[in-house]
From Swiss-Prot:
Function (record text): Catalyzes the transfer of a geranylgeranyl moiety from geranylgeranyl diphosphate to a cysteine at the fourth position from the C-terminus of proteins with the C-terminal sequence Cys-aliphatic-aliphatic-X. Known substrates include RAC1, RAC2, RAP1A and RAP1B.
One GO cellular component, as annotated: CAAX-protein geranylgeranyltransferase complex
Organism per entry: Rattus norvegicus
The protein, known as: Geranylgeranyl transferase type-1 subunit beta
A Gene Ontology biological process term: protein geranylgeranylation
Binding site for Zn(2+): D269, C271, H321
Length: 377
């Protein structure tokens, strides 16, 4: 059998550490959508997030043709927590992470099945909607009003969000998930934006990074979540002054060593090449970073045998770091990788498809409004 380009690169000695082995990463993401290793079993309740990393990773590699899109779309819709006939569970709607509860398979828009322990999870709703858009679905079977009602029920008085209606930790991660959900559904009624903005604003720490909440430690991940949320809202420059933005930029740019770390005096980690790199991109100063050092670090964590990326060199690859490693390389315009939308965390091709979808909804609503006016007159 003829050797692939990746096989030739993998046998090329010193150059193998610095070559991006695209085909191996495609196969790695394919495996993530099939039977997972035992060590992933604890993630069963959030399987939809693993599907997101794999599907968006394949999309970034322009390789979605290797999966059965229709089957995956049906599976994702079966995870939607739909309103019951009496709509008494609206505050619990959204998407669950997998079929672990044994709820009947229902990929339709029919009324849901009442279950005392069934509810959506904010991160699963975010990744579920993202996956559907990545796969080219038009979201016609998403009960948008129910998703937004479920989202509203998760916002707390301080403006942050918890993950599930039963209560959980509440922090900047879920503010970002909520912002993405509202942005994708093109409807910001799912949150009190003023309260969410206030929460982001109060989370700015003494050293000018953003924390998970007020009074906590600045972190690269929470800084991304806060800045990206404001960008999706179109409020970044209203919330922070130019002087404050310059301080945030300085804090972010100081996170680079070779790759990036999330906090001072912590080791670099592959995923921060996206979290911090995307923040710098949104702040329009990514071009001032050292691309070569960042690229070399990311590729030093590449598994040259099975594909994927790890958080550190000589560690096991996983779906999360494989995806964010590729997104980090995309920010530097690596050959063979599509461009990433830094705020929404999907390919720009997917973000453009979403924009077209929003336009079609707007056209449909305008026509319906016009028809109603015509009928009433």
């Amino acid at each position: 059998m003829a050797a692939t380009e990746d096989d030739r690169l993998a046998g090329s000695g010193e150059g193998e550490r610095l070559d991006f082995l695209r085909d191996r990463h495609v196969r790695f993401f394919q495996r993530c959508l099939q039977v997972l290793p035992e060590r992933y079993s604890s993630l069963e309740t959030s399987r939809l997030t693993i599907a997101f990393f794999a599907l968006s990773g394949l999309d970034m590699l322009d390789s979605l043709d290797v999966v059965n899109k229709d089957d995956i779309i049906e599976w994702i819709y079966s995870l939607q927590v739909l309103p019951t006939e009496d709509r008494s569970n609206l505050d619990r709607c959204g998407f669950r992470g997998s079929s672990y509860l044994g709820i009947p398979f229902n990929p339709s828009k029919n009324p849901g099945t009442a279950h005392p322990y069934d509810s959506g999870h904010i991160a699963m709703t975010y990744t579920g909607l993202s996956c559907l858009i990545i796969l080219g679905d038009d979201l016609s079977r998403v009960d948008k009003e129910a998703c937004l009602a479920g989202l509203r029920a998760l916002q707390l008085e301080d403006g942050s969000f918890c993950a599930v209606p039963e209560g959980s930790e509440n922090d900047m991660r879920f503010v970002y998930c909520a912002s993405c959900i509202c942005y994708m559904l093109n409807n910001w009624s799912g949150m009190d934006m003023k309260k969410a903005i206030s929460y982001i604003r109060r989370s700015m720490s003494y050293d000018n990074g953003l924390a998970q909440g007020a009074g906590l430690e600045s972190h690269g991940g929470s800084t991304f979540c806060g800045i990206a949320s404001l960008c999706l809202m179109g409020k970044l420059e209203e919330v922070f002054s130019e002087k404050e933005l310059n301080r945030i930029k300085r804090w972010c740019i100081m996170r680079q060593q070779n790759g990036y770390h999330g906090r001072p005096n912590k080791p670099v980690d592959t995923c921060y090449s996206f979290w911090v790199g995307a923040t710098l991109k949104l702040l329009k100063i990514f071009q001032y970073t050292n691309f070569e050092k960042n690229r070399n670090y990311i590729l030093s964590t590449q598994d040259r045998l099975v594909g994927g990326f790890a958080k550190w060199p000589d560690s096991h690859p996983d779906a999360l770091h494989a995806y964010f490693g590729i997104c980090g390389l995309s920010l530097m315009e690596e050959s063979g990788i599509c461009k990433v939308h830094p705020a929404l965390n999907v390919s720009t091709r997917t973000s453009e498809r979403l924009r077209d979808l929003h336009q079609s909804w707007k056209t449909k609503d305008s026509k319906q409004c016009s028809d109603n006016v015509h009928i009433s007159s």
